[in-house]
Design a protein with these regions (language model features):
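Gram-positive cell-envelope targeting signals
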Residues: 1-58, 236, 321
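Compositionally biased, intrinsically disordered low-complexity regions
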Residues: 19, 31, 38-43, 99, ...
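Short, flexible coil/linker elements and helix-boundary hinge sites characteristic
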Residues: 36, 178, 342-346
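Active-site-adjacent loops and short helices of periplasmic peptidoglycan-processing enzymes
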Residues: 55, 59-234, 243-244, 311
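Penicillin-recognizing serine hydrolase domain
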Residues: 71-94, 196-352
Length: 352
């Protein structure tokens, strides 16, 4: 009887031991499988799977947002005075003006450069920047509508010449906006990018904020007068400097002429001529080469001009606002580069 009891106890212990051993083996198998899965294949595949299957945590969301919102400004030149900065000679026209070294931002000469003024069509340089940075394909087309033309005609704004119903490419619109200062072209590009002028203007102001511009505010994409549409000569120089760093913007601002092929609405096609290079060649002064820029005018702003030029291997930016006439703006631009950058003389207009 005792032997029978001992035999049963041994069997019970054997069963318990077998169960424990089986459980240990099962746990070990799970651990091994998990370890094997974690190390089979390369790490890139695991990471890729994780990005697809793991929902973002708060930290990951913040990282993603910071990457998306990282400023696209590679380098913003902020005009600043130094001990060598001079006052712009009073003989040069313009209520506000600044000449800067485009590479360092150092002000060579200035006058009321931080004082608020109206930018007129110099506005379109910021319009150009925002458009180019948000357009993926310049061959996309935009239909010119009555609503794009009528308001601009009503205020006698400059037009590129597109007709209602035409479908120019974005490239054609941007050339029309820069070279001819075409208001309808600016409005069409803005509507393509943002759906409306109002939304696009918000993007312009956001861009100004990104660039650290504290004295610039826009209310329209064209440069029409509005008391809340303003900038400074210094901040307009910063905007032009930014545009110059974008190859597309620089190409547009440096263009002399651009031709649009004939259409049913414009059977002879369109030829856009630069309002800047239509008044100067750019190489009138020894050692100075004006490379590009933009002009503007409203009754309230008077004549405005901003240019970039190369002198002895250095690039400079000059902004003059509030000039008496368009020719004063041109002649003084040539003179300032010559005198202040090349050590030359003032420009002497040819006798009529």
């Amino acid at each position: 009887m005792n032997h029978e009891r001992e035999r049963r106890v041994r069997i019970r212990y054997l069963r318990v031991g077998a169960a424990v051993l089986l459980l240990v083996l099962m746990v070990a198998g799970v651990v091994f499988a998990a370890y094997g899965c974690g190390n089979s294949g390369d790490e890139d595949n695991v990471t890729a799977d994780a990005e697809v299957t793991i929902p973002p945590t708060e930290a990951l969301t913040e990282l993603t947002e910071s990457e998306v919102q990282e400023p696209v400004v590679p380098f913003v030149v902020y005009p600043h005075r130094s001990e060598s900065s001079a006052e712009l000679d009073k003989k040069y026209s313009g209520k506000n003006g600044v000449l800067i070294n485009a590479e360092t931002g150092e002000i060579v000469a200035g006058r009321n450069e931080d004082k608020q003024c109206y930018p007129a069509s110099l506005t379109k340089v910021m319009t150009l920047i925002v458009a180019v940075e948000n357009i993926k394909d310049l061959s996309d087309t935009v239909e010119i509508t009555y609503d794009m033309l009528a308001p601009m005609i009503a205020v006698d704004a400059s037009l590129a010449g597109f007709a209602e119903g035409e479908k120019p490419t974005l490239e054609q619109l941007l050339y029309g906006m820069v070279l001819e200062s075409g208001a309808e072209a600016a409005l069409a590009a803005a509507c393509y990018v943002a759906g409306s002028e109002t939304s696009f203007v918000e993007m312009m102001n956001e861009k100004a904020e990104q660039m650290g511009l504290t004295k610039t505010h826009f209310t329209n994409v064209v440069g029409l007068h509005d008391k809340n549409h303003y900038s400074t000569a210094a901040e307009m120089a910063a905007i032009l400097s930014y545009a110059m760093q974008n190859d597309t913007c620089r190409k547009l601002l440096s263009a002399v002429e651009y031709k649009v092929p004939p259409t049913k609405k414009n059977p002879e096609g369109l030829t856009f001529a630069s309002t800047l290079f239509g008044r100067m060649y750019g190489d009138e002064m020894p050692g100075v080469k004006v490379l590009g820029g933009k002009t503007g005018y409203t009754d309230e702003a008077d004549n405005c001009i901003e240019t970039f030029a190369e002198v002895n291997g250095t690039t400079y930016i000059l902004v003059l606002c509030g000039c008496n006439t368009r020719w004063d703006a041109i002649y003084d631009t040539l003179s300032v580069y010559s005198v202040c950058c090349a050590g030359g003389k003032d420009y002497e207009p040819p006798e009529k």
